[in-house]
Amino acid sequence: MKPNVVSADVLFEAFRSPLKWEWVAGLGASERRFDEVAVRSARSGADLVGYLNYIHPYRVQILGEREIAYLVNATPEDCKRRIARIVTLEPPVLVLADSQMAPDALLSMCERAQIPMFATHESSAFVIDVLRAYLSKHFADRITMHGVFMDILGLGVLITGESGLGKSELGLELISRGNGLVADDAVDFFRINQTTIEGKCPDLLQNLLEVRGIGLLDIRAIFGETAVRRKMRLRLIVHLVRKETLEREYERLPYEPLTQDVLGVPVLKVVIQVVAGRNIAVLVEAAVRNTILNLRGIDTYQEFVERHRRAMEQRDGS
């Protein structure tokens, strides 16, 4: 699900201090919003903000030094036409950057069309970077998943599995081994660009871990600030299963790495069988270390296949 609402006044207040901007025109349009169709079709926040461009409607139009020069350095008729064309773009907001002064005709147009216009001394490139990052997160596709999300050896790992397999207890043991908790039970994931999924904890569950028989534990209070994380990029899913499930649904040694689709992004996945006596925490850390090697281009399975092929060739040649 992708949220599709952010109004001009919300955007203004969010960056009143960072961008030190002023609301110079269109004060009566505080509820003006992004076009919902444009938001749904946008691949990321980068599609929703940019320099003044007449072929990209429905986005925040940034007016820097060059854009203002283009609007005013022409005959009076051309200036009027160029400024009037901005209305057809239906921008949610106009932003004057680079300490530029708005031409009177532009101010009048914003008042007539009720288009909010903000002005800042910051550079246009900086404004675009800041707004793109904000809009990418605000309008990101999102989903809530059940599991324990952790920082294990610097990698964002989601532990999933059937109920009663001890996911939270496993999380507690991993925390005691120096890893960090992001979220327990419910994890909010956001696709912030085409290949990146970021996860964080809902505010209501911040720092909390539920362990059966003990109850709710405040991990930050018990283990300290370094035992919790605000957010992490999802890089691996560890799925816990019972023996019969593993034998029925999964190969013992899969030829291709397993993946799971999360918001349209394939995420690496490993399956670990839960049996009495197994040290699951050690197995999870081993899976994470192996994933780190894979991300660096080191594939142990493919190296084994190549080693086996060479051995077969040597045997056939002898």
Swiss-Prot record:
This molecule's function is given as: Catalyzes the ATP- as well as the pyrophosphate-dependent phosphorylation of a specific serine residue in HPr, a phosphocarrier protein of the phosphoenolpyruvate-dependent sugar phosphotransferase system (PTS). HprK/P also catalyzes the pyrophosphate-producing, inorganic phosphate-dependent dephosphorylation (phosphorolysis) of seryl-phosphorylated HPr (P-Ser-HPr).
Pfam families noted in UniProt: Hpr_kinase_C, Hpr_kinase_N
Q: Where is this region: Important for the catalytic mechanism of both phosphorylation and dephosphorylation?
A: 209-218
Q: Which Gene3D superfamilies match?
A: HprK N-terminal domain-like, P-loop containing nucleotide triphosphate hydrolases
Matching entries from HAMAP family are given as: HPr_kinase
Active site, renumbered = H146, K167, D185 (proton acceptor), R252
Q: How does it assemble?
A: Homohexamer.
Q: What is the official name of this protein in its record?
A: HPr kinase/phosphorylase
Family the UniProt entry places it in: Belongs to the HPrK/P family.
Establish whether keyword S-adenosyl-L-methionine is in the entry: no
Annotated spans, Important for the catalytic mechanism of dephosphorylation:
273-278
Task: Provide the gene name from the record.
Answer: hprK
Signal sequence coordinates? none
Indicate which residues the UniProt annotation says bind Mg(2+): S168, E210
Note the superkingdom of the native organism.
Answer: Bacteria
Kind of enzyme, top EC level? transferase
Query: Residues that bind ATP, according to the entry?
Result: G161, E162, S163, G164, L165, G166, K167, S168
Catalysis performed (reactions): [HPr protein]-L-serine + ATP = [HPr protein]-O-phospho-L-serine + ADP + H(+); [HPr protein]-O-phospho-L-serine + phosphate + H(+) = [HPr protein]-L-serine + diphosphate
Comment text on domains: The Walker A ATP-binding motif also binds Pi and PPi.
Report the cofactors. Answer: Mg(2+)
Tell me the Gene Ontology biological-process terms attached to this UniProt entry: regulation of carbohydrate metabolic process
This enzyme's EC code(s): 2.7.11.-, 2.7.4.-
What keywords tag this UniProt record?
ATP-binding, Kinase, Magnesium, Metal-binding, Multifunctional enzyme, Nucleotide-binding, Serine/threonine-protein kinase, Transferase
Question: Per the record's keyword annotation, is Kinase included, yes or no?
Answer: yes
**Anything further noted?**
Both phosphorylation and phosphorolysis are carried out by the same active site and suggest a common mechanism for both reactions.
One example of the protein's molecular function in GO is: phosphorelay sensor kinase activity
